[in-house]
Structure formats: C-alpha cells, structure tokens
C-alpha cells in the first residue's frame, strides 16, 4: 500500500475542495513547488497533482505551477485534470510528469484510453469519480448513467496502469474512504485500484491495508495531511511495516 500525497491546483495555488465544489476551496499554500518538496521530505513516494481549473475547462490551465512542482522534486508524479487529447499527454510527459490521469475523456471516449495506452505504455492511469456509485465527469459537475464498475471493466486489457477511484461524497469530508465500494471495484477488475476521497486517520489506512489483497494498491490523501489530521511520515511508516 502506497500513500500518495495530493496537490490540487487552482489559480496556481495548492487548494482543497469539499466534495469537488470549486466555490468551497481552502488555499493551503501559494507555492506548489515548496509544497511538493515538503511532501517529498516527509517520505512521499509519488505525488498526485490535479489541475482543477483544467478539469472544469477541459484543457490545461496551471502549466507554470505544474512545471515548478516537477522541477522541485525527484519522486515520480502523476497528473490529471483537463487531459482530453494525445498532444496534451505528450506535452506533460515531455515536461517530466511520470503518469497522466484520464478522467472525463475516459468515460466519453474509451477508445482514447486504448490509443493513449498503446502510444505511452505504462504511463496512463484512469480516474473514475463516482457519486452514489455512478460515474461523474467534467470536474464532477455532471453525473452519468454508468456505474464505476461498468466503466472500469471497459479498460481491461488496454494496458491501464491503475484506476484511481474517488468517492465524491467522501472527498474532503474527513469521514473515511468508502471501503466497501473500493473493495467491490477492485475485486471486479484486474487493474490495480488506488483509493481516493475521505482519508482521515491512521485507522482508515489500516482498513485499506486490510483490503489490499483485493487489488487496492494505494491511497491518495489531501485534506487529512494539510489539516494535520494525519502525519504523512507516520502514515507512510505504517504502510512500510506491512510491506
């Protein structure tokens, strides 16, 4: 189990949203590069970056902040938000981003995921965000009629590195991840699943470690480490004990 610290970017700053609502944002740091260095210093093994403005606009919006993060750290990075075409993937990978996350475009155009995986093997992650089990897209502004499991199954065999599963109702609410839904998704597919949304305590991490054998390989944390509810270094030490 790998703990993955998140940096969510809005207007060039590190922010956290509640349940994906852009108007419910809290700025935690106006220097994303410095924040990235801090998470690396505490033992972060991968950084999760989200271009929130990009997710809503459907095109990259925080390039200079993303560049600052990549230049500041030596650990791998993964980035999502507004990635809708091959050219954008290419641009981010050449910038030094390790893996890109396809979200809305994966639901709207599954063939795009297949094409991206063929062109950039090992570099493509699919982000599936769900509200009451149904996939939400366009920065979570629109809920579709397809379930998370139905969507995830479409990518079996495409070469997707991982699926990031976010339960929107838990995101930023500090109520613990949706263990049941995450486990059910991981058991339904062969692709490794990374949990996201709601992590609030070391107990939550223990609960996720308990379902690791189902195929849950990591967890993304944002608000909990920014607010101090979880100490990142302690959380990482806990997972390393189990490895």
UniProtKB/Swiss-Prot annotation:
Gene3D superfamilies: Aldolase class I. Transmembrane segments: none annotated. Its main location: cytoplasm. This is 1-(5-phosphoribosyl)-5-[(5-phosphoribosylamino)methylideneamino] imidazole-4-carboxamide isomerase. GO terms for biological process: L-histidine biosynthetic process; L-tryptophan biosynthetic process. Pfam families: His_biosynth. It catalyses: 1-(5-phospho-beta-D-ribosyl)-5-[(5-phospho-beta-D-ribosylamino)methylideneamino]imidazole-4-carboxamide = 5-[(5-phospho-1-deoxy-D-ribulos-1-ylimino)methylamino]-1-(5-phospho-beta-D-ribosyl)imidazole-4-carboxamide. It is an enzyme of class 5 (isomerase). GO terms for cellular component: cytoplasm. Belongs to the HisA/HisF family. Its EC number is 5.3.1.16. The gene is hisA. Pathway: Amino-acid biosynthesis; L-histidine biosynthesis; L-histidine from 5-phospho-alpha-D-ribose 1-diphosphate: step 4/9. One of its GO terms (molecular function) is 1-(5-phosphoribosyl)-5-[(5-phosphoribosylamino)methylideneamino]imidazole-4-carboxamide isomerase activity. CDD domains: HisA. SUPFAM superfamilies: Ribulose-phoshate binding barrel. The active site is at residues 8, 129. Keywords: Amino-acid biosynthesis, Cytoplasm, Histidine biosynthesis, Isomerase. It comes from Geobacter sp. (strain M21). It is found in: Cytoplasm. Signal peptide: none annotated.
């Amino acid at each position: 189990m790998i703990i993955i610290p998140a940096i969510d970017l809005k207007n060039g700053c590190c922010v956290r949203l509640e349940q994906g609502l852009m108007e419910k944002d809290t700025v935690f740091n106006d220097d994303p590069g410095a924040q990235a260095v801090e998470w690396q210093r505490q033992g972060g093994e991968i950084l999760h970056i989200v271009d929130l403005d990009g997710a809503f606009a459907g095109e990259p919006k925080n390039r200079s902040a993303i560049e600052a993060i990549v230049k500041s750290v030596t650990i791998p990075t993964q980035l999502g938000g507004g990635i809708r075409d091959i050219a954008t993937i290419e641009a981010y990978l050449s910038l030094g981003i390790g893996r890109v996350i396809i979200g809305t475009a994966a639901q709207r155009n599954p063939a795009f995921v297949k094409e991206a995986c063929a062109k950039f093997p090992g570099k493509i992650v699919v982000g599936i965000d769900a509200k009451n089990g149904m996939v939400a897209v366009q920065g979570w502004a629109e809920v579709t009629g397809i379930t998370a499991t139905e969507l995830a199954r479409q990518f079996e065999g495409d070469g997707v590195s991982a699926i990031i599963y976010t339960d929107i109702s838990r995101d930023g609410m500090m109520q613990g991840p949706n263990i049941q839904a995450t486990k059910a998704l991981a058991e339904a597919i062969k692709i490794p699943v990374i949990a996201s949304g709601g992590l609030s305590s070391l107990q939550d991490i223990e609960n996720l470690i308990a379902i690791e054998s189902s195929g849950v390989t990591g967890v993304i944390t944002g608000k909990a480490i920014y607010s101090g509810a979880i100490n990142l270094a302690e959380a990482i030490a806990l997972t390393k004990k189990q490895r």
